[in-house]
Amino acid sequence: MDYQPNTSLRLSLPSYKNHQLNLELVLEPSSMSSSSSSSTNSSSCLEQPRVFSCNYCQRKFYSSQALGGHQNAHKLERTLAKKSRELFRSSNTVDSDQPYPFSGRFELYGRGYQGFLESGGSRDFSARRVPESGLDQDQEKSHLDLSLRL
């Protein structure tokens, strides 16, 4: 039997249950005689198209490629759901009394203000960790410079 490419496009309207338009491109074998080709066409029309079913939602597809693309969408959904669960789990496991890394405030307090330097002060700048609640009231008042200079 001689196989020469003979493509045909089968179109069918969607039924009321299945709202998908069936556009199936089929490569059918053709033979030398027209009578045998007509018999192969009639037998291929009687054959049921192969149906591929999704394991997750039971949706039906007429090609394995379409099913593969559809299952990739399910894979993406599962990946996003997993990441969301992991993020939620990690945020719940952090102890509320423990600060997050790098959440403490670090501030520079220098004794090198211009007025202080003019009066003979040193340029010693020190970094110290400030508690989350801020400075004590007495410490805050002692570091506050209210002088105005032009």
From Swiss-Prot:
Cell compartment(s), UniProt: Nucleus
GO function term, MF aspect, one: zinc ion binding
Keyword Endoplasmic reticulum set for record: no
Cystine connections: none
Entry's Gene Ontology cellular component terms: nucleus
Region (Disordered): 120-146
InterPro entries named among the record's database cross-references: ZFP3-like (IPR044246), Znf_C2H2_sf (IPR036236), Znf_C2H2_type (IPR013087)
Keyword Lipid metabolism belongs to the record: no
A GO BP entry: regulation of DNA-templated transcription
Keywords for the protein's UniProt record, in alphabetical order: Metal-binding, Nucleus, Zinc, Zinc-finger
Principal subcellular localisation of the protein: nucleus
Zinc finger (C2H2-type): 52-74
Tissue specificity remark: Highly expressed at in the abscission zone (AZ) of petals, stamens, sepals and siliques. Expressed at lower levels in stamens, carpels, cotyledons, major veins of rosette leaves, trichomes of inflorescence leaves and stems.
Additional information: Plants over-expressing ZFP2 fail in the abscission of floral organs (sepals, petals and stamens) after anthesis.
Assembly and interaction partners: Interacts with DOF4.7.
Role description: Probable transcription factor involved in the regulation of floral organ abscission. Participates in processes that directly or indirectly influence shedding of floral organs.
Name the UniProt record assigns to this protein: Zinc finger protein 2
Organism of origin: Arabidopsis thaliana
Lineage of producing organism: Eukaryota, Viridiplantae, Streptophyta, Embryophyta, Tracheophyta
Gene: ZFP2
